[in-house]
Amino acid sequence: MDQHQITIFVVAVVAIVLAAALGFFVARKRRSQRLRERFGPEYDRVLQKEGEVSRAEGVLAMRATRREKFELRPLTAALRSDFSDRWSAVQAEFVDNPKGAVSGADQLVNEVMKARGYPVVDFDQRAADISVDHPVVVENYRAAHEIALRHSRGQASTEDLRRAMVHYRSLFQELLQDSIPVRELPHRREARA
């Protein structure tokens, strides 16, 4: 090989390495952007907890992979109606028995999750699983759970319990809304009219 061929070879190798590095960084940036869009505020929460982008994104990607294995299903109209009626009863109970209502709300949210096809294991895993499909309201779920734990230690006021009910309701409503087939959603009916 003469000097000219060596120079061409070196330039070609450097160009290939630079192109590969650029491709890697572009792919990584796209992955980060997709995860940030999918998980919203949950992305930032996990990043803060993990302290490193690659670890946080690995956690979120594992959650998404785990979630893809679930066979989520919509609720039937009868189940939606039953759950809605039971939620109304839990809310009404709050007036006379706030702690019982919060406990009932937690139990009812778990039942809806189970009926939809989410595995109902320990709280942290439930929150991680639900964060894939409901990244905004999962923080409400965590807040409600934290209030319930504080209440069990005698550290939550009635106002705290009221906030827990509001937080549980946000997830409850989203789980029920997700189970309505698209053709039944109000905005879809209006768009067709």
How would you describe each model-predicted region?
Residues 30-140, 144-156:
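Elongated extramembrane "stalk/tether" segments
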Residues 1-15:
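Feature marks short, highly hydrophobic, charge-poor N-terminal signal-anchor/signal peptide-like helices
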Residues 146-193:
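Extracytoplasmic/periplasmic C-terminal soluble domains
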Residues 2-4, 26, 181:
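Serine/threonine-biased, Pro/acidic-interspersed low-complexity stretches characteristic
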Residues 18-32:
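Cytosolic-side junction of a single-pass transmembrane alpha-helix
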Residues 13-16, 20, 165:
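Intrinsic disorder/low-complexity segments
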Residues 1-3, 101, 184, 189:
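A generic alpha-helix propensity feature with a strong bias for hydrophobic helices
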